[in-house]
Amino acid sequence: LRVDWARARMPVLAALKEEALNTKPLAGMKVAGCLHVTKETAVLIETIAAAGAEISWSGCNPLSTQDDVAAWLAAEGYSIHAWHGQSVEDFYWCIDKTLEFKPTLTLDDGADLIVRVHGEKSEYADGVIGGTEETTTGVHRLRAMGKAGDLKYPVIAVNDAITKWDFDNVYGTGQSTIDGILRATSVLIAGKTFVVAGYGHCGKGVAMRAQGMGANV
């Protein structure tokens, strides 16, 4: 199973899970997640559950859900509202279903769930004590809400963490962007002129990977 493959290659989460099984730091918490439903996220969900939390989950992208992983998580007893190829209506229906169990914590990627809690589903906001947001785009949305005085609970900007910049943004985004280009085009990158617009941590990673494959960047 793909989850086994991911679990074997995520030693930090494995160590945290082992510790959490004894300490239960999230006992009594109800976590609503809106992240990509992939084999890696499945390992995160297992870890959060091991820490004592109840879980309800939806996908943050209509096209990123790995259906076999979603089915496996559901079979394991987790509340999963996600499938590949959702319409816009499906996407928000799944977020709404995720919120129905009245979370105390939210985990978001793009801020769609958090914005929903502050808008159409504001009846759930009072029960939330905090959340996280992973992406630059989502953080911008939430900072605008905070500046306007509209943010109803504290949110940790995961994207501001140095480990996020220097590992995920540089190496993760760099590799996955090149992987996406290769899957879409099957083009040989060596010898090509490769233009990167923007030179933050993500752009730096893309430029490094392209240069490493022989492109003129």
Stretches with model-predicted labels:
Residues 33-35, 108-109:
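Short His-Asn-centered micro-motif
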Residues 28-33, 157, 194-197:
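Short hydrophobic beta-strand segments
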Residues 30-32, 45-64:
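Active-site cofactor/substrate anionic-group-binding motifs, chiefly glycine-
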